[in-house]
Curated annotation (Swiss-Prot):
Residues 347-394 are annotated as: DNA-binding. This is Minor capsid protein VP2. It comes from KI polyomavirus (isolate Stockholm 350) (KIPyV). The lineage of its organism: Viruses, Monodnaviria, Shotokuvirae, Cossaviricota, Papovaviricetes. A motif (Nuclear localization signal) lies at residues 359-369. GO terms for cellular component: host cell; host cell endoplasmic reticulum membrane; host cell nucleus; membrane; viral capsid.
Length: 400
């Protein structure tokens, strides 16, 4: 990781001795892969055997020796591959230009090797406003020259991300968004992505499970103000899943109590239905995950995150707010909408009728109907009176 501290030195050397290093290595790819360093060794060894000295500048030597090490370090750390590819791509672009240190008007497209910058590379939009310290450079447009990264400390660091890398983003932002803004954007991102997916959006918006999920997420973000260690929303999600599992078991017990136990007589059809539901859930998950917007030049593929909290910031395409939704939130949302948590509404209604007896208003209505005037009701009352008197006389006679 110490090679990252030498990034300003590498960029400055690429400006001063980039053309010389490119002529020695033959190509920018050879510099990045280490072939240029081998070529440099062959030249110096051959000159030593002949007893001659070939003047090679210190800047060119730095480029040939440090760039391969930087490439290996960025590829070894998976979390910094995206940022390393863009950084090395910027160095390569500076070396491949007609005037070392300037970026050509037409930037190459991205490649899997990380040697070229990604499509739409715009360092100025991503917060790179670099100026040369060695000589004035005439870039295709202002602010596009590569120079050492400004060194200043970040007041609040982010675990797992070097300060100098985050400074590239922080220099473009006037201030970081508040926790409430972060939560609102994440919630809006979840709703909008699922709405655009078009899969049972009404049920998901109106479901109590989603409301409880968002409340748990909000609680997780608010807890950050008290302690960083207690702000991880993953714990809240895990608790939510456990509570949903217990709720599902309670609903099954309600079904059995209501007289509708689970149908186990057809295991084959039940298994096939479960497999179909799982396939549909997986398809929805993949579709929704693929439709999520991604920033073109974020340092990480999922944005900058702090212990599970995803921070949104403007991208290089014009100040549009971007967000990144982690996969576990999508997974939990899919689980909340799974068929295992759905039970027949008939059983629920029957159980509710048993738990909630007839209301007093219904009883009053029945009493009014029974007391309404009518011949039948009068005859019935007379018959009842006659029966009661006859019974009382017989009892008295027996007693006498």
């Amino acid at each position: 990781m110490g090679i990252f501290l030498a990034v300003p030195e590498i960029i400055a050397a690429s400006i001063a001795g980039g053309a010389e290093a490119l002529s020695i290595a033959g190509s920018g790819a050879a510099i990045a892969t280490g072939e240029g360093l081998a070529a440099l060794g062959g030249i110096t060894e051959g000159a030593a055997l002949l007893g001659e000295t070939i003047p090679i500048s210190e800047a060119a030597t730095t480029v040939l020796t440090k760039v391969p090490e930087l490439v290996q370090a960025t590829q070894a750390v998976t979390a910094a591959v995206q940022g390393g590819a863009g950084l090395v791509g910027g160095i390569y672009t500076a070396l491949a230009s007609d005037h070392p240190g300037d970026l050509p008007p037409n930037t190459p497209t991205g490649s899997a090797s990380g040697l070229h910058p990604t499509s739409g590379y715009n360092p100025q939009g991503a917060g790179l406003n670099l100026q040369s310290v060695h000589k004035p450079i005439h870039a295709p447009y202002s602010g596009m020259a590569l120079v050492p990264i400004p060194e200043y400390q970040l007041e609040t660091g982010i675990p797992g991300i070097p300060d100098w890398l985050f400074n590239l983003v922080a220099s473009y932002l006037p201030e970081l968004p508040s926790l409430q803004d972060v939560f609102n954007r994440i919630a809006f991102g979840i709703w909008s992505s699922y709405y655009n997916a078009g899969s049972t959006v009404v049920n998901r918006v109106l479901s109590d499970e989603i409301q409880r999920l968002l409340r748990d997420l909000e609680y997780g973000f608010r807890a950050t103000l008290a302690s960083i260690g207690e702000s991880d929303p993953v714990n809240a999600i895990a608790t939510q899943v456990r509570s949903l599992a217990s709720t599902a078991r309670e609903r099954e017990l309600l079904q059995i109590t209501a007289g509708q136990p689970l149908d186990l007589s057809r295991p084959t059809s039940a298994l096939s239905a479960a497999a179909g539901a799982l396939t549909e859930a997986a398809y929805n998950f993949i579709y929704d995950a693929s439709s999520l917007p991604k920033d073109g030049f974020n340092a990480l593929s999922e944005g900058v995150h702090r212990l599970g909290q995803w921070i949104s910031f403007s991208g290089p395409t014009g100040g549009t707010p971007h967000y990144a939704t982690p996969d576990w939130i999508l997974y939990v949302l899919e689980q909340l909408n799974a068929d295992t948590y759905k039970i027949p509404t008939q059983a629920v209604k029957r159980k509710q009728d048993e738990l909630h007896p007839v209301s007093p208003t219904k009883k009053a209505n029945k009493a009014k109907k029974s007391s309404s005037p009518g011949t039948n009701s009068g005859n019935r009352s007379k018959k009842r009176r006659g029966r009661s008197t006859s019974r009382s006389t017989t009892v008295r006679r027996n007693r006498i």
